């Protein structure tokens, strides 16, 4: 009897799930149909305004009121977004000109969406970023609303607000936004910031100078994100990175980021510092030697090779691994490292043999691809 009861309960749950899936599919299908119909209505109205633009006229005031009224509903905004995607594929120049005349509508909608639920509030900054609605014209009302969203606990609000601000092309806006994030209590991953800053539509050289100028005003976590951005962006900040690296008061994580920067962009004056850091004199600070062993790959030479060969005998696995990887990437062969390969340190020999085996396998795979 107990087994039969369990079977009935199981069948009831399965039936409920099937009914739920059917209802959900019906609701979503009806919603898609409404979105298509709404997109068609928007398209009809907007094509009329584009005809006016083509004849040298402005977008009608009543059309702006029409948009301000309807687009406050998220469902209509989704339909508007779908219509704009199609319009940009067909007539990109006219679509851009049309949107450029909706400044007042954008400000109004930004304020209205800022009062909505946090998920809905995060949606409009996504639209701003997608169509570059404030590129080279950062309306104060819109920018202030984005600053407000940066103080929210929702990661969607903060990330989408930053994405919108990247399109302003205004370095001052970005620096203020970074300070707001830095002063907030919510965690914001440095990779999101480093990758996001690469999408900045303004002058990256000017932004880099602004970062250097205000660098000391930020927390170590934000400084690390900034250094990662500079590393991915350009090699114009080598002197700045070296100065930070040589300053022992700089946070360790920031100094690690500086070593990686100098490993990506070889800088002569940094060579001696990197050689010194690659020598592990303190097991408690092995990270410097490990990261510097990787960076030295960009500084080939006899001193570099000798330093890396000595690191193959380190007690720390990461130091040995990075040193072997750098030696292999520098193109050294078995014969060049015969003294290590035929030496008495089994760990040094094994890690080099591993690197050479990996290189040989990669070369064989490449040859097979060429012949096939």
Where are these regions (language model features)?
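Short amphipathic alpha-helical segments that mediate assembly, nucleic-acid/protein binding
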Residues: 43, 63-64, 80, 255, ...
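Structural detector for internal amphipathic alpha-helices that build alpha-solenoid repeat scaffolds
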Residues: 82, 86, 90-100, 122-134, ...
């Amino acid at each position: 009897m107990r087994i039969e009861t369990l079977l009935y309960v199981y069948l009831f749950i399965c039936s409920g799930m099937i009914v739920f899936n059917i209802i959900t599919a019906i609701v979503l299908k009806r919603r898609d149909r409404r979105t298509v119909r709404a997109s068609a209505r928007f398209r009809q109205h907007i094509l009329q305004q584009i005809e006016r633009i083509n004849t040298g006229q402005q977008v009608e005031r009543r059309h702006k009121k029409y948009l301000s009224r309807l687009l406050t509903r998220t469902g209509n905004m989704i339909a508007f977004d779908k219509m704009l995607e199609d319009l940009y594929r067909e007539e990109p120049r006219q679509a851009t000109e049309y949107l450029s005349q909706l400044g007042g509508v954008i400000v109004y909608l930004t304020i209205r969406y800022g009062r909505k639920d946090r998920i809905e509030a995060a949606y409009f900054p996504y639209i701003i970023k997608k169509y570059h609605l404030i590129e080279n014209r950062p309306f104060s009302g819109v920018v202030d609303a984005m600053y407000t969203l940066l103080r929210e606990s929702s990661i969607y609000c903060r990330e989408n607000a930053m994405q919108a601000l990247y399109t302003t092309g205004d370095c001052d806006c970005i620096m203020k936004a970074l300070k707001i994030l830095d002063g907030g209590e919510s965690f914001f991953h440095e990779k999101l910031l480093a990758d996001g800053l690469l999408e900045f539509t303004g002058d990256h050289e000017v932004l880099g100078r602004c970062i250097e100028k205000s660098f000391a005003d930020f927390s170590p976590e934000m400084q690390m994100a900034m250094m990662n951005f500079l590393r991915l962006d350009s090699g114009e900040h080598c002197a700045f990175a070296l100065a930070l690296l040589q300053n022992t008061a700089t946070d360790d994580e920031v100094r690690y980021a500086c070593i990686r920067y100098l490993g990506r962009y070889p800088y002569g004056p940094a060579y001696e510092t990197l050689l010194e850091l690659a020598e592990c004199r303190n097991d408690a600070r092995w990270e410097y030697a490990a990261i510097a062993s990787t960076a030295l790959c960009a500084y080939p030479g006899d001193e570099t090779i000798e330093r890396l060969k000595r690191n193959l005998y380190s007690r720390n696995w990461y130091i040995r691994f990075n040193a072997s990887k750098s030696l292999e990437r520098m193109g050294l062969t078995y014969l060049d490292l015969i003294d290590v390969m035929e030496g008495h340190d089994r760990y040094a020999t094994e890690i080099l043999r591993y690197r050479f085996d990996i290189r040989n396998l990669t070369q064989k795979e490449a040859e097979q691809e060429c012949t096939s």
